[in-house]
């Protein structure tokens, strides 16, 4: 089993648990250059809020899009957008990535901006 398939297996197991609980999820995806975050409704078919380093507004705030500063900007932005839609509590879906580095920074920034998880 290679690294990618192991990560996907971990993500599938976590998503199955969250789907059974019926909670709103904060889903992240990480690439070497960008980081993406979405708040997905409990039914799994509706994106309530989203933010990523691909957006022009966030790219203007940071010097480089693949570091912790960029992840913090995305975390803050997605939390503000989710709170504006009335979402206050979410489950953190790290998509099988380790809770370390940019993933942890995004989560901490979202918590500081007011999301609860």
Swiss-Prot record:
Keyword RNA-binding part of the UniProt annotation: yes
Gene Ontology MF annotations: 5S rRNA binding; structural constituent of ribosome
Protein's UniProt keywords contain Ribonucleoprotein: yes
CDD domains in the cross-refs: Ribosomal_L18_L5e
Superkingdom of the source species: Bacteria
Any single Pfam family the record assigns to this protein: Ribosomal_L18p
InterPro entries noted in UniProt: Ribosomal_uL18_bac-type (IPR004389), Ribosomal_uL18_bac/euk (IPR005484)
Keywords annotated in UniProt: Ribonucleoprotein, Ribosomal protein, RNA-binding, rRNA-binding
Example of a GO biological process term: translation
Ranges in coiled-coil conformation: none
GO cellular component, one term: cytosolic large ribosomal subunit
Subunit structure and binding partners: Part of the 50S ribosomal subunit; part of the 5S rRNA/L5/L18/L25 subcomplex. Contacts the 5S and 23S rRNAs.
HAMAP family reported for this sequence: Ribosomal_uL18_B
Role, per record: This is one of the proteins that bind and probably mediate the attachment of the 5S RNA into the large ribosomal subunit, where it forms part of the central protuberance.
Family: Belongs to the universal ribosomal protein uL18 family.
Protein name as catalogued: Large ribosomal subunit protein uL18
Organism: Haemophilus influenzae (strain ATCC 51907 / DSM 11121 / KW20 / Rd)
